Amino acid sequence: MSLPEHSPLGKPSAYKTEYDATLLFPIARQPKRTEIGLPAGKPVPFFGVDIWNAYEVSWLNMRGKPQVALATFIIPSDTPNIIESKSFKLYLNSFNQTKIASPEALQQLLHHDLSEATGGTVQVRLVTEADLGKQKMGELEGLLLDRLDIEVDRYEPAPDLLKADQQESPVEETLVSHLLKSNCLVTGQPDWGSVQIRYVGAPINQEGLLKYLISFRNHNEFHEQCVERIFMDVMRECKPVKLAVYARYTRRGGLDINPFRTNFNTPWPDNLRNARQ
C-alpha cells in the first residue's frame, strides 16, 4: 500500500518533461475511512465524485508546437485510491516536451493512466484554446453561515459542536461557508476552501455548524478525507434524512480539488470555478 509519507510531497523533485505514467502516486482511501468509523469490506453511507481541475496542461503537437488546455478529471468516490496531488502535477508536467497526435489522443492517455492508478473509471474533459473564452465562474449557492458573529476557540475537528433540534419539523436547507481551512496531511501547508451543505432533516444549529467547520483550521488531512469526515460527523450528530457536502478548494500547483459526497440521488454539482479559485 502506498503511504502518504512516501509520496513526493515535501521532497525535492526532478521535473520530468517527457511522459512518465509512473509518476502518479495512488493512496488508498480505506485507512482514513477506517478512522471515521467506516470499516473495510462494508458499504459506505455516501457516494460522489472528486472533481479535479488542471490549469497547467501542455504538450507538443507532432510538429513540435506547444499546445495548452484546461483539464477536468472526475474520479468516483468508490475508487479504492486517490491520487496524491504533487504526483499528479509532476505527471501532467511530464507531457510538456512530449509529442501527442491530438487532444483526443491525450484525453485517452489521461483516462487510461488515471483509471489504472485510482482503480476505477476516471472521466477526462479537455478545454482547448478555442473554447477558453466560454468558461464560466460562479459561487456556491446557499445561506451564508459566515454572516454570524460568533466566538471561536476550537481549531481541531469538534463534532460535539454540531446540534440539530429533533423536536422541530424537518426543513430543506442549503448552507455555505468560505471559512473552511485544513492543512496538507504530509507538509502541513494550508488548504483553503468553500463548503456547501445541503440537507433535509431536523434544523441544524447554524452557529454550531459554522464553529465546527472552522474547527478544521489546524487539522491535517487531504481534501477528500476532510469532506468525508464532515459528512460522517453531520450524519451522526444531526441525523439528516438527506445530506450532500460539496467543497471547492483553492488551487495549488496548478490543480484544484473539489470533493462531493451525498447519500441521495442528485446530479453532480456544477463545476464552476469560484472567485477564490
UniProtKB/Swiss-Prot annotation:
Which residues, by range, are in coiled-coil regions?
none
Location in or out of the cell:
Cytoplasm
Reading the lineage from the top rank, the first entry is: Bacteria
Q: Which residues bind NADPH?
A: S85, K86, R252, G253
**UniProt keyword Oxidoreductase present:** yes
Q: Which reaction(s) does its UniProt entry say it catalyses?
A: 7-aminomethyl-7-carbaguanine + 2 NADP(+) = 7-cyano-7-deazaguanine + 2 NADPH + 3 H(+)
Q: What GO molecular function annotation could you give as one example from this UniProt entry?
A: preQ1 synthase activity
A Pfam family that the UniProt record links to this protein:
QueF_N
Cite the binding residues for substrate: I83, E84, S85, H223, E224
Choose one Gene Ontology CC annotation of this protein and give it: cytoplasm
Annotated keywords: Cytoplasm, NADP, Oxidoreductase, Queuosine biosynthesis
* Catalytic-site annotation from UniProt: C184, D191
Q: In which pathway does it act?
A: tRNA modification; tRNA-queuosine biosynthesis
Q: Of which family is this protein a member?
A: Belongs to the GTP cyclohydrolase I family. QueF type 2 subfamily.
Q: How does it assemble?
A: Homodimer.
This chain belongs to the protein called NADPH-dependent 7-cyano-7-deazaguanine reductase
Protein's organism: Cupriavidus pinatubonensis (strain JMP 134 / LMG 1197) (Cupriavidus necator (strain JMP 134))
